[in-house]
Amino acid sequence: MRSDQIKKGDQQAPARSLLHATGQIKEPTDMNKPFVAICNSYIDIVPGHVHLRELANIAKEAIREAGAIPFEFNTIGVDDGIAMGHIGMRYSLPSREIIADAAETVINAHWFDGVFYIPNCDKITPGMLMAAVRTNVPAIFCSGGPMKAGLSAQGKALTLSSMFEAVGAFKGGSMTQEEFLDMEQNACPTCGSCAGMFTANSMNCLMEVLGLALPYNGTALAVSDQRREMIRQAAFQLVENIKNDLKPRDIVTKEALDDAFALDMAMGGSTNTVLHTLAIANEAGVDYDLKRINEIAKRTPYLSKIAPSSSYSMHDVHEAGGVPAIINELMKKEGTLHPDRVTVTGKTLRENNEGKEIQNEDVIHPLDNPYDKEGGLSILYGNLAPNGAVIKVGGVDPEIKTFKGKAICFDSHDEAVEAIDNHTVREGHVVVIRYEGPKGGPGMPEMLAPTSSIVGRGLGKDVALITDGRFSGATRGIAVGHVSPEAASGGPIGLIHDGDEITIDLTNRTLDVEVSDEVLEQRKSERKPFKAKVKTGYLARYTALVTSANTGGVMKVPEYLIEE
């Protein structure tokens, strides 16, 4: 066992003394059992994580019952909804790297034999997943689960995206103070990740098809008995996997990553999943080309439209059959998935999900009646995005196939929000928000406030937005993000002028500014070099080491330090 490094031999007597002092070693024979880390992310200020201490205690009991010794540690967490629209959002994506590094540090410093990961929201799930693939120690994931959907006084289903859009509606005068306060108090009624197909739930659903979590991980409610039983079963499965030496890199292959994108397409998941899945590919040593995502989109139907793209919540999806029903439906179309690869259950993806039929075809459409024959995400290329950009086409009005408009440019999120709120932004505009990428932000902040304000003011079909920043999973409308290269790295998005005509072509998956190459080259020669906005602390180090969105926005050591 890996843990023999810290508990076997005379030279490890001091370490054994310290282990006895923890109180986790109950019997002398415990030193002969696997040591299992519980990588938790309990934190009081994140509603998706306030109940994780309870779940960790259930995991501890089950791990001990299964014949191993549990040791819990905690990571940090940032709630994107609370951090939205201010300096706090600069820390959200960078927190993913801290979580991965922190988990790696504890796991390798103490030579654990296996790891039970308990994530839930935003950057915690991908951060832990990066650590799992990096350390390649037997691992299993069981998230905290989604919250129930809210309900307004008028009986309307609510999620957090409803609240963000309500801000725009209230400021625009189409919502009363009473209605606004009612939504505020009822949008998030329980603990758990936000109830729609936002980043947290997108990633927790993807964990099922990747093969690192048990079925229904993405949809069983945080407050349900099923969630607690799932924790127990996952603990037993992990101890079995330690015995069989089943490791994350045995599971997370290029085919598994393909299937993650396919499920994302079928469910119209968050654009952030592209960023995170590319980061996971990097940790797994898998060379994953962005263009592969469009190939997957072309063969994957869009089967389930969930909030913010509809009124359906994650609980509705669960009642309709959950992710297993969607996987089972996709398996019926040959070539869509790779169903015969191994998963954390020790069984194949096919064995985990075959026969799990759709229970409500209004929520999960069958293959013969998809929302669209192609998936809900697209990668756009063109002279504005030579290395790609991402749009959630599932969140765009189906009638819109092409959008042409005049650029109105802003070099920060805050400037754009002010212009939208004071009606400077009008119908026919393409709002360009730049210098908000991984380096430029820094931290690639989410642009939920401007997109929500656009939709909330009734301009969702008439105004587009492009940015080198990213979007919340709650974003909908004509919103193109992750434009690469970013402005801070010299990307052409930094060369756009007010009034330039921009074309977003969803059919041909292109993003272009109607300006000649000669003019762009002239503008490039006149552009001043970017200077980092933050000079000290973590964000300064992040700015120096972070890479482009098209490679997952990961931090990399400079090549000159690792060249042989």
UniProtKB/Swiss-Prot annotation:
Sequence positions that bind [2Fe-2S] cluster: 121, 194
Enzyme class name: lyase
Disulfide linkage: none
Residues binding Mg(2+): 80, 122-123, 446
Keyword Metal-binding appears in the UniProt entry: yes
Co-factor note (free text): Binds 1 [2Fe-2S] cluster per subunit. This cluster acts as a Lewis acid cofactor.
EC number: 4.2.1.9
PROSITE patterns linked: ILVD_EDD_1 (PS00886), ILVD_EDD_2 (PS00887)
Comp. bias intervals (Basic and acidic residues): 1-10
Keywords, sorted A to Z: 2Fe-2S, Amino-acid biosynthesis, Branched-chain amino acid biosynthesis, Iron, Iron-sulfur, Lyase, Magnesium, Metal-binding
GO terms classed as biological process: isoleucine biosynthetic process; L-valine biosynthetic process
Catalytic residue positions: 472
Catalysed reactions listed for this entry: (2R)-2,3-dihydroxy-3-methylbutanoate = 3-methyl-2-oxobutanoate + H2O; (2R,3R)-2,3-dihydroxy-3-methylpentanoate = (S)-3-methyl-2-oxopentanoate + H2O
Cofactor: [2Fe-2S] cluster; Mg(2+)
Keyword flag Iron-sulfur: yes
Region (Disordered): 1-20
Family (UniProt): Belongs to the IlvD/Edd family.
Subunit structure: Homodimer.
Stated name of the protein: Dihydroxy-acid dehydratase
Species annotation: Staphylococcus carnosus (strain TM300)
Underlying gene: ilvD
